[in-house]
C-alpha cells in the first residue's frame, strides 16, 4: 500500500536522500525508458509510496475497493514528490487539499479529479486491465515507443527538476525531530507528541 516506514527511522539525511533518489528518480527513469505503456491496477489501498508507484504509470485503473491518500503529512513528513505532478493533474487547490489534509479518498473522487483513468468493478478489474494491455500491444511498437516518449517529454519537461527539489524537501522534513517522532508513533500505534 505504501512505503515501509522503518526505512526512514533514525536515518541520516544522506541515507534518506540516496534511498529517495532510487525510489523517485530511478523509478521514473525505468518507467520512462521501458518503451511501452505501463498500467497501474489498484484494487485496495494506495498510500505514499504506493501512490508514487501508481502515478509513475501511464494509465491508472482502480476498482470501487480502491482508496488513496497522502498520509505523510500526518507523520511530520512531506508528500513532496507529489508536489511536482498532482497540481498539474487535478489543479492547485484540490492538490493542496489532498496533500496537506492527509485524508483518505476513494475511486469515485479519484475519477472525478482525473487522477485515475477508469473505475472498474472489483471482480472485473484484472480482466479489464488485461484487455487494455492487449489492445495496446496490438499497436505499432515503433509508434507506441516514439509516441509515448514524445508524450512524456512534452508533459514532464520539468519533472526531473521537480523531483530533485522534492527529494531535498522530503529529506529536510524527514530528519526533523517531528518527523522522527511521527514515524515512531505510527510504528508504535500511538499519537505523536509534536515539539512546539
Describe each PLM feature range:
Residues 1-29, 46, 158:
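Glycine- (often His-adjacent) and acidic-residue-rich active-site loop
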Residues 98-99, 150-153, 168-174:
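Helix-loop "lid/cap" segments that line or gate small-molecule binding pockets
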Residues 3, 90, 111, 162-165:
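Alpha-helix N-cap/N′ positions at the starts of helices
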Residues 184-196:
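Terminal low-complexity tails and localization/encapsulation signals of metabolic enzymes
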Amino acid at each position: 500500500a505504501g512505503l515501509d516506514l522503518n526505512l526512514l527511522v533514525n536515518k541520516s539525511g544522506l541515507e534518506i536522500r540516496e534511498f529517495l533518489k532510487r525510489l523517485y528518480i530511478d523509478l521514473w527513469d525505468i518507467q520512462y525508458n521501458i518503451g511501452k505503456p505501463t498500467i497501474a491496477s489498484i484494487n485496495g489501498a494506495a498510500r505514499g509510496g504506493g501512490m508514487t508507484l501508481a502515478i509513475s504509470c501511464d494509465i491508472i485503473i482502480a476498482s470501487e475497493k480502491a482508496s488513496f491518500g497522502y498520509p505523510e503529512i500526518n507523520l511530520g513528513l512531506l508528500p513532496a514528490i507529489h508536489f511536482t505532478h498532482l497540481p498539474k493533474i487535478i489543479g492547485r487547490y484540490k492538490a493542496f487539499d489532498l496533500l496537506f489534509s492527509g485524508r483518505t479518498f476513494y475511486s469515485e473522487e479519484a475519477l472525478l479529479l482525473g487522477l485515475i483513468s477508469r473505475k472498474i468493478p472489483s471482480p472485473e478489474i484484472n480482466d479489464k486491465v488485461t484487455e487494455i494491455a492487449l489492445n495496446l500491444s496490438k499497436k505499432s511498437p515503433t509508434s507506441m515507443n516514439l509516441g509515448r516518449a514524445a508524450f512524456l517529454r512534452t508533459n514532464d519537461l520539468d519533472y526531473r527538476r521537480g523531483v530533485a527539489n522534492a527529494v531535498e524537501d522530503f529529506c529536510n522534513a524527514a530528519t526533523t525531530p517531528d518527523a522522527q517522532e511521527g514515524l515512531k508513533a505510527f510504528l508504535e500505534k500511538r499519537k505523536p507528541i509534536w515539539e512546539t
